[in-house]
Each structure stands twice: as C-alpha cells, then as structure tokens.
C-alpha cells in the first residue's frame, strides 16, 4: 500500500491533470488571446495548408523510399547482440549499382563521438541513411534517431514539436491524465508517476525550452506556429527534437547548416556532453575539433578509423601515409633489385643460379603476403577568381543608412556609416535576425535603405553568393551547357570544361543534368558561375553549406588570392580565421568592429552561454 505522503502526492498530481483537461475559452498566440470563434474562422484555410503539407511530406517520404530501394547493404554483426557497442564486418554499400563501400568494417563504441568525413559525393549521407533505417544489422535494443530533414509547416509550436517526440513520456502522461480523470486506483497511478520521474517528465518542458533557446528561439518564438517559420528555423526545431529525445545512437548530417555562430557554439558545447554514440557529418573543422573523440574517414571504398579530433586525425594520417610511402618505395626497390638479379644471374654459374632461385622465392613470398599499396591522395582542388582590375576608392560608401522591412516593423539598422573598397576583407557575425544577409542585400541594391544613402562606384561589379543561388540553376541543363549559356563569349567547349574542372566538376559530372548532382556539386556550379561574373567585390553568404572540407580550403585559398574586396557571412569559424582581416558584429541595429580575431569572438560567445544559463533556468521555471 502506498504511504500517506505518496497518496497526497498522487492527489496533488491528479488535481493538476484535471486542471490541464479543463476547456479554455481562448489561448495565447504571439502574446494575444485568440478566442474559439477566431480559431474556427481559420479552420478552412488551415485545412488547405495541412493538405499541401501532407502532400509535400508524402513526396519527401516517397523520394526517401526510392533512394532506399536503390540502395543495397550487406554486413555481419560481429559484436555481442546485447552489447552497447556496434561492430559490423564485411560491410558493403552500393547505390544504383555504384559501389560506395566494399568489404569494410563499421565500429561504433558507446561513449564515443564520431566525425564521418570524406569528399563530396563519396556516400557519407548514404551511409547514415542505411544505419538510420537499420539496413545494417544493429541490435534492436539500440534506439537510433537520424536527423534527415526540417519539420513541415503546421499549427504546432516549436515547444510542442520538441516535447511530442518523446513518445514514451507522452504516452505515460496521457495515461496518467486518463487515470486521474477516472479516479483510478492510486497504486497504478503511482507506478506511472515513478516512471515519469525517471524520464524527468516534470522537467521535460524546461529541458525542451532550454534546447530551443540554445538554438536561437526566444520564449515568444517557442510559442509561434511552425508554419510562420522559414525552412532554416524549422530545421532547428528538427535538431532540437533530436537532442531532446536522447537516443542511444544519434546521427546528424551537417547539423550546423542554417545556424549562426551563437547557435554553433551552443551546439558544440551541448554535443560535448553526449555520452552514448554520436555520428555526425560536418564540413566544419572547428566543430569537429570541439565535438569529436574519433574520426571515420570514408575513402577508397573503406572506412578508416582515427582516435582524436580532426586536427589529431590530420596529424596521424600524415604520419601513417608518410610511413606507408616509405614502405612502398622500399618494397618497390627490393622487387626491382631482385628481378634484375634473377634476370642477370638466373642462368649463370651454379652458385649464382642458386642465389637467383633464393631471391625468386623471397620475391614470391613478398608477393603472396601482400605488398604495400601506394597512397591514394584525395583529389586537390584549385579554385580561381579571375583578375578584376583596379578601381579607385571609395568603392561603396554607406551614409546615415537606416532600414526596416515595413513601415511599422522593427528597425534592423539605424544610422550606419562606413565605407568598403578592394582591400576590404570582413566577416559579418551576430545572431540570426540581426541583419547580416540584409546588409549584403542593401549593398548590392537588392534592398533600398529606408533612410540615408549608399553610393557605389559607377564601374563596380558585385558578385553575391547566397543560400538560394542553387534555385536559379536550370536543372535540365548540364553544368557545361549552363555555363556556355551564361557565358556565350566562351566559344570552345574544351575551354569551358577546363574552367568548370577547376571547381571540382570533372568528366561525367560536367555533362550530366544538374538535377542529378549532389548539393555540394551544385554549389560548385554556382561558385564557377559567380567567379566568371568577374566581380570586384565578393559578398559570400554561407558559402560552405554542403561543401566538403577540401573544397572549403580551396575556396579559402582562392579568396586570399583574389584581387578584389570580400564580405563574408559564415558559421564556419575556420574559414573566417583563414580569410577575414576584420570582424564586424551586427547587433542592436548597428555594426561594431570586434577588437580581436574570430577565435576570441568564439570565446566571448562561450562566456555568454555560461552567464545566460542561470537566467534561463530561472525563466523556464516560470514558464
């Protein structure tokens, strides 16, 4: 029988459950009370929107099913079925008949955080999908959560979307409310409450709110409808769900895409505490360094394992490859020497012939035991921005500029005053919504100032790379056809092939329809197109999304060799460190120059997280 204290506790929780079930006359929406008649008026429109969302969701699911059908995976579980470690041998993976992995091993150990790296198009995302859909033999007791796409737009709030993902907790709470409403036996109710306590049910909303806050959602945003957010923000909600559920195996594919630097720093600190199995694909060396305990290199149809973060991987791999090449050259020298000796003395005197036979046996043993292979290096890229010529300063002058999107809307910038020229190398940083992309649009003329003036040199050409540039590509054309169409002055196809080849698109990729290319390859088409605009100023808004690490390094080298000016918006700390000479912070309707480098700014963001934590805990207690 339960104690008196337990009975009182159960009675209290029962009353709270009943209170939650009482109908309300209205609910809060963006700070305003919305009554039931107002809700009813929206039903017809919402019904239409829901139908469209359902159709889009079904299309995405069908697409994923087609991809899965074109994928073939084989492998054998080598670890104990009850183990929390996963060891799979003889792993092979093919997609549309193309072999991505061949007779390799997958080793994922509990408590380790793995960074999965490799060139664009090599099959990293395909491998994550195969693991997430259990196409490899992973024991059932290991639950897997694979973050695949953004949340579809709906009337749900981000907070609700995050909390509903914990299905066991939601089911237990629903059952507890039902029993409380029916005035059921106290013992059964107590069992449910005990299980909910184990799942931190009382703290679930606080934890969900903390995660959303870390990813940039203010308290008001957490209660807005999902359909009012852009795709990037809905992707953050999907990421928050993945973090909230705490699966035993968490699979993240480019989790920092669509995040600002503040959210990247928070996510890095959050993932550092993940104690189960984490596998993430990321193009950010800085992020991989901060999070990962191990690196998996997908290369030459094999998975190769390295202990340590990304920097340690680079060091270890270089040492191993140097030793491998030394061994390779030594073996080749030995083989050449023995073959030469056998050819010269194999038919000589008896003594020399015996020595030749001995060397032939040694050679056969070497060949039978397996020779060291030559190191196959990743293909190196060499991006190129053509010379733009000189124009005298000032190239762009910003004079007392203020901007707001609507007459009654909030002011994004107030009285900006600065100039930029061909020597400018600036990274714009600051939280989402502070106006970084807005500033680039103002400077290009895509947006006009509400007040003030922006003066540009009459001959200046500006090239702006942004996240939606891919949408402007003609997907039915090949990269070669698209570039020939955009730049008809280049008559020879071979010349254009060389141009495109510098951006990592070679052979069949140049003549395949753009729709068949990976996101990273489409980005390269956009970069090639941008470069041959021959701009004086490069405005780069998140250029690293979908690019691999080697491509980002090639882009950084090209920017550093570029004769013109550059303004960059990026969540990649390492790229900023490589190319930016100044850091400008966009915040509170103005722009201020940061006194240090980007690494000092990152430490500043970390210290802000520490300062905000007590305030956040206090605020979420009052939710």
From Swiss-Prot:
- PTM annotation (N6-acetyllysine): residues: 304
UniProt lists the family membership as follows: Belongs to the ABC transporter superfamily. ABCF family. EF3 subfamily.
Q: Which interval of the chain is the signal sequence? A: none
Name the GO cellular-component terms. membrane; plasma membrane
Alphabetized InterPro entries for the sequence: AAA+_ATPase, ABC_tran_Xtn, ABC_transporter-like_ATP-bd, ABC_transporter-like_CS, ABCF_EF3_subfamily, P-loop_NTPase
Q: Where is the composition biased (Basic and acidic residues)?
A: 39-51
The modified positions for Phosphoserine read 512
Kindly give the Pfam families that the UniProt entry links to this protein.
ABC_tran, ABC_tran_Xtn
Q: Which gene encodes it?
A: ABCF2
Q: Which UniProt keywords apply?
A: Acetylation, ATP-binding, Nucleotide-binding, Phosphoprotein, Repeat
| Alphabetized GO MF terms | ATP binding; ATP hydrolysis activity
Q: Which domain of life is it from?
A: Eukaryota
Tell me yes or no: is Phosphoprotein among this UniProt entry's keywords.
yes
Give the matching SMART domains.
AAA (SM00382)
Identify the residues that bind ATP 2: 430-437
Q: Which residues carry this modification: Phosphothreonine?
A: 218
Q: What is this protein called?
A: ATP-binding cassette sub-family F member 2
Q: Which SUPFAM superfamilies match?
A: P-loop containing nucleoside triphosphate hydrolases
């Amino acid at each position: 029988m339960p104690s008196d204290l337990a009975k009182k506790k159960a009675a209290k929780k029962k009353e709270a459950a009943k209170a939650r079930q009482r109908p309300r006359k209205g609910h809060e929406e963006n700070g305003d009370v919305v009554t039931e008649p107002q809700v009813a008026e929206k039903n017809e429109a919402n019904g239409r929107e829901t139908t469209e969302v359902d159709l889009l969701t079904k299309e995405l699911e069908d697409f994923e099913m087609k991809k899965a059908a074109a994928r073939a995976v084989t492998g054998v579980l080598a670890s104990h079925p009850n183990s929390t470690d996963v060891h799979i041998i003889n792993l092979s993976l093919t997609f549309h008949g193309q072999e991505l992995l061949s007779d390799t091993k997958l080793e994922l150990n509990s408590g380790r955080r793995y960074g999965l790296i490799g060139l664009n198009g090599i099959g990293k995302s395909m491998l994550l999908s195969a693991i997430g859909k259990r196409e490899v033999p992973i024991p059932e007791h290991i639950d897997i959560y694979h973050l695949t796409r953004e949340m579809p737009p709906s009337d749900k709030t981000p907070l609700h979307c995050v909390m509903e993902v914990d299905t066991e907790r939601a089911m237990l709470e629903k059952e507890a409310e039902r029993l409380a409403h029916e005035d059921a036996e106290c013992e059964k109710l107590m069992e449910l409450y005990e299980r909910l306590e184990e799942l931190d049910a009382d703290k679930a909303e606080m934890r969900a709110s903390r995660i959303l806050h870390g990813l940039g959602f203010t308290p008001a945003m957490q209660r807005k409808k999902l359909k009012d957010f852009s795709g990037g923000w809905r992707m953050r909600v999907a990421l928050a769900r993945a973090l909230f559920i705490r699966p035993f195996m968490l699979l993240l594919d480019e989790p920092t895409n669509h995040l600002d630097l503040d959210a990247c720093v928070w996510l890095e600190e959050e993932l550092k505490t993940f104690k189960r199995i984490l596998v993430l694909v990321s193009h950010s060396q800085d992020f991989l360094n901060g999070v990962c305990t191990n690196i998996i290199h997908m290369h030459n149809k094999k998975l190769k394992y390295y202990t340590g973060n990304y920097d340690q991987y680079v060091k270890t791999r270089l040492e191993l490859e140097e030793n491998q090449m030394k061994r390779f050259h030594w073996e080749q020298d030995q083989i050449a020497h023995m073959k030469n000796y056998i050819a010269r003395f194999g038919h000589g005197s008896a003594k020399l012939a015996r020595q030749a036979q001995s060397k032939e046996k040694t050679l056969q043993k070497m060949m039978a035991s397996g020779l060291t292979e030559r190191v196959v290096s990743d293909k190196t890229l060499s991006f190129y921005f053509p010379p733009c010529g000189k124009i005298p300063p000032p190239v762009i002058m910003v004079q007392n500029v203020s901007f707001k999107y609507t007459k009654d809307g909030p002011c994004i910038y107030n009285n900006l005053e600065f100039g930029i020229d061909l020597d400018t190398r600036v990274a714009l940083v600051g939280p989402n919504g502070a106006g970084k992309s807005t500033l680039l649009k103002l400077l290009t003329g895509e947006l006009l100032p509400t007040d003030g003036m922006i003066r540009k040199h009459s001959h200046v050409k500006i090239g702006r790379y942004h996240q939606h540039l891919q949408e402007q590509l003609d997907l039915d054309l090949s990269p070669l056809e698209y570039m020939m169409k955009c730049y008809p002055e280049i008559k020879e196809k071979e010349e254009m092939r060389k141009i495109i080849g510098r951006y990592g698109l070679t052979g069949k990729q140049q003549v395949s329809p753009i729709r068949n290319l990976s996101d990273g390859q489409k980005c390269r088409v956009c970069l090639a197109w941008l470069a041959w605009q021959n701009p004086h100023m490069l405005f780069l808004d998140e250029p690293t999304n979908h690019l691999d690490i080697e491509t980002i390094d090639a882009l950084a080298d090209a920017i550093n060799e570029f004769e013109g000016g550059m303004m960059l918006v990026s969540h990649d700390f390492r790229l900023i460190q490589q190319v930016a000479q100044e850091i400008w912070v966009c915040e509170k309707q103005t722009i201020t120059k940061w006194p240090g480098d980007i690494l000092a700014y990152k430490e500043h963001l970390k210290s802000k997280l520490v300062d905000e934590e007590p305030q956040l805990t206090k605020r979420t207690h009052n939710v």
